Swiss-Prot record:
This is Pyruvate dehydrogenase E1 component subunit alpha, somatic form, mitochondrial. GO terms for molecular function: metal ion binding; pyruvate dehydrogenase (acetyl-transferring) activity. Pyruvate binds at H92, Y118, R119, A157, G165, V167, D196, G197, A198, N225, Y227. The lineage of its organism: Eukaryota, Metazoa, Chordata, Craniata, Vertebrata. Thiamine diphosphate binds at Y118, R119, G165, V167, D196, G197, A198, N225, H292. Pyruvate dehydrogenase activity is inhibited by phosphorylation of PDHA1; it is reactivated by dephosphorylation. Its cofactor is thiamine diphosphate; Mg(2+).
Amino acid sequence: MRKMLAAVSRVLSGASQKPASRVLVASRNFANDATFEIKKCDLHRLEEGPPVTTVLTREDGLKYYRMMQTVRRMELKADQLYKQKIIRGFCHLCDGQEACCVGLEAGINPTDHLITAYRAHGFTFTRGLSVREILAELTGRKGGCAKGKGGSMHMYAKNFYGGNGIVGAQVPLGAGIALACKYNGKDEVCLTLYGDGAANQGQIFGAYNMAALWKLPCIFICENNRYGMGTSVERAAASTDYYKRGDFIPGLRVDGMDILCVREATRFAAAYCRSGKGPILMELQTYRYHGHSMSDPGVSYRTREEIQEVRSKSDPIMLLKDRMVNSNLASVEELKEIDVEVRKEIEDAAQFATADPEPPLEELGYHIYSSDPPFEVRGANQWIKFKSVS
């Protein structure tokens, strides 16, 4: 009897040392998965599109929630560091658009490729880099993903080609990456992203044409967040049906605020490209909470009420949270624990990003050539290694 009481005492003692929420989560039986109805995609030159129901596992749901919260908190921390003048220069935040970067990544393979414009922090994270590397890049430190030389608009990772500062210029590059996939006989696709503000660029239509001619495995993706800088899509485009703008290229319009819609549409598009049918176009209808950049307050061309309405009715993180809680895939307490862990991760990364040293001046000329540069050509001078004065 004494042994039994001692065993019970040890169990209770161990439980008392853990947070109450963790004890409750550990003792609760959650569903392994749940089926959800999702919004039907609008189609162009397609007889059928992505499914209108999808299964979400508890494991995937928790992973997506953590990733979206991480992107959200990372962007809010970047906002804070910018206002403290620790981050300088251009800075474009993607809070509100988390379902796009996380949902797209959930629909492809790590060996697939992705290229985007300058609102790239979220994609840099979902492609596999850490918050520490991203924030350190924003602050221009040696530990940044581009050694502190790229900043907000020029981040890179394996199979992630930026972060490009010229509006629309990444789209022909994405078609070129898809050409390389086909030329090398690899079962890979390239996600080529651009915004509604870039959608009227002539180079994009040229990329459409070549991709269709050569049947390239390229998924053209227009992130339609309703505004190109401060200009609404209705004032900028004669046709706002961006998923139809490829004309001869099939397209689909997707609810970009719903991660499950984005995931299923991406899986559909990737399968289409892998089958050898050529390119496809996706329009993700999304919304950014911040202004175009940090110099844009974001309320001169739209109202605060409009922003708040989207936050209250269509927030991608809240939508996933409600689904998971209501279907017994997770508890409110468990998701709150994730929130706490994410906040700590962001704070730790921010401390590193402010304490890490800046790259010395002599590294200014590094990482330009893949091998020893041909300085003897045309009498070019050797790079002079200046000593850093910082």
